[in-house]
Amino acid sequence: MDPNNREKDDRPRPAKALPVRTGHSSRPSSSTTSSGVLMVGPNFRVGKKIGCGNFGELRLGKNLYTNEYVAIKLEPIKSRAPQLHLEYRFYKQLGNTAEGLPQVFYFGPCGKYNAMVLELLGPSLEDLFDLCDRTFTLKTVLMIAIQLISRMEYVHSKNLIYRDVKPENFLIGRQGNKKEHIIHIIDFGLAKEYIDPETKKHIPYREHKSLTGTARYMSINTHLGKEQSRRDDLEALGHMFMYFLRGSLPWQGLKADTLKERYQKIGDTKRNTPVEVLCENFPEEMATYLRYVRRLDFFEKPDYDYLRTLFSELFERKGYTFDCVYDWVGRPIPTPGGSVHVDSGTSAITRESHAHRERPSQTQPLRNQTGVPDRRGAWDLQVGRQAHPAYLVPHLASDRHGGSVQVMSSTNGQLNADDQTGGHSNAPITAQAEVEVVEEAKCCCFFKRKRKNHSQRHHK
């Protein structure tokens, strides 16, 4: 892969903060200054809210030692389903140096909240998909695919499965940064260790598992209640690649009386849609990829090199150059702000202690957590008054389009006038007990914009 932009990055380097505090020190790791400014640790100033979800909210922050902007993810300490520390642990397990992973600068308490400070990244693939009129060219999809196979291979090499594939969880770097053409993977709130840390053996095959992930992209076996493994992450990627090429998937827009029935319909439609039909009018390699990953055994290690080569050879055969000139290059990318992007995806989720929510219908007015309707492009945050995106790193585990929202916190806490770190949550939708779901209008960790109301726009 040739991440084109090798020119010198004239922006300050990512914040090299003090060693990450785990929140177990007796020394307070947050304070409020005399001017009422909230701090996380000794050097991270908490700014305005730029995202929210059932976990809590995401804030823009600044490292006062380096003047670098960061993302600060907040989760109420008394959350009924805390996951931020687990996500932090997974980030540490993945390491801070791998390409395409956000840096984690700090974890510790912040008043009534736990806080995780992360690198700021650019917009998600879903936002860029919107920007490109909801279709990507084959060249762009292949450049994305080759990178994401490598990202998933790396995650798997650290004994983790991701379980939350959706365009909202893959972000480019910030404009003008040397990482701007690299596709990053974020939000490990639904990740799971597939190698038992005690026995060092693969987790056992199980059935009758709750759905975990995003219904639009999840594997067929996940719909069937089978325990997920490496194969399921790769199948979900394949569904996402076809979503980008086609503009929609055959199982979008299905109606049902209950969420459980709807997820059942989505799974049934996936099973009944032949790969040849799903990939019709596109290169055979797309179908070959899906056939391969769907045939993998639960315990089997995928041949990542084979899959990368499949797409790399197609890329070369088409005469493309890996110049990182994606479809969105040259288009005006909006300045980041505090608007909330809502998605039309369908999520059915639980993960032991995590539940997910389903989006409201597109005819239902979607509002951000302040009750003000969101508008596409309503970016009221100027980072240093520069026109580069500074969307926060991990779309909070509860985020938008594909909608896998773990119900991390259900505090529904309202902010007091002087409380700069309140969390909010959405009211749960009643669903069958086997599938915990909550209504989804989730917001990304970075930003969520209300989509254009295209009449042809794809539905859940």
UniProtKB/Swiss-Prot annotation:
Residues 44-315 form the Protein kinase domain. It comes from the Eukaryota. Residues 25-35 have a biased composition (Low complexity). ATP binds at residues 50-58, 73. Residues 1-36, 351-374, 402-426 are annotated as: Disordered. Its main location: cytoplasm. Belongs to the protein kinase superfamily. CK1 Ser/Thr protein kinase family. Casein kinase I subfamily. This is Casein kinase I isoform gamma-1. It comes from Xenopus laevis (African clawed frog). The gene is csnk1g1.
